[in-house]
Amino acid sequence: MRTFFLAYLAEGYGPVGRVDEGLAVLAEAMALVESTGVCIYEAELYRIKGELTLKRPEAGSNSEVQEEAETYFRQALNVARLQSAKSWELRATMSLARLLAQHGRRDEARAMLAEIYGWFTEGFDTADLKDAKVLLDELSA
């Protein structure tokens, strides 16, 4: 459970501009995954690392930082797929889709989000699926 709480503590630092602190907490969470072998949250850790990377001050104009974030999102996707963790896969896909759309790759973003969204047959009233639907509609407009 500690990894779970560290993940969301790290994520919480992003919106208040404390990115370095968030990344430090995330490093602690990733170290726990390594030391314990409990990797249930690993995909989400990579996704959060990508989100925090995009909040670094130099991220806006630095394509290397944005490529780094994309790499973390793709790592999150790979881990989620290996674990058959569809909820983590959805979250990682949404993060990646937003980044791709910002760089003119809307068709790619829409296609990958539509694929994972289409997998779900229930739970459409959950926050993640509602957010995915909104994003999918935006990408389709």
Language-model segments: which ranges?
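Helix-coil-helix junctions within alpha-helical repeat/solenoid scaffolds
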Residues: 1-141
